[in-house]
Amino acid sequence: MQIELGEETKYLEFDSEHLLSKKPMQIDVLVKNERHVKIQKNIGRIFRQYNIVEYKSPEDDLNIDDFYKVYAYACIYKADTETVDFIPAAELTITFVCYHYPRTMLQKLHRDRQITVENMESGIYYLMGDAIPMQLIIVPRLSKTNNYWLNNLRNDLKSGGEIRNFIEKYGKNKNSKLYQALAEIGRAHV
């Protein structure tokens, strides 16, 4: 490469075997779905067979670099298999779960990649115009009835009614390992 570029190499820096990340790359959550099952729950309707989910904490904003990092993870997940095209691109989705509407990121995606946003229902937005289906879930905008648990996974539950209601609903399921994990996450955010 350097020889081919000749005189222009003085303007370039070459870094062979460049490490892409200082820490191991990991996906927040990978949701695998059986191919023939169409998910009916509103947050999972977009799901295909392999679904990459990125969570942002209530304190964090979703920015353009987060978008590209997760998009790259989806591409690496698709490509890093034993056989070529083992994971078809058509079977991938990306879900971003956050607490603040990422207006700046979405404006940049529209400007640079012509990706548009379609509001599917309260708190659920599809990012249209890319080969990989993507959705954006804004937790505080979700329906409090349809998405009770996700909506209450935050650090600003109001004392009294909200907390009492959460504890009552949790109490009915406290023996479930999933609900115990949810309570642990809730404690970590308080």
Summary of predicted features, one role per range:
Residues 1-189:
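Elongated, amphipathic alpha-helical interaction scaffolds
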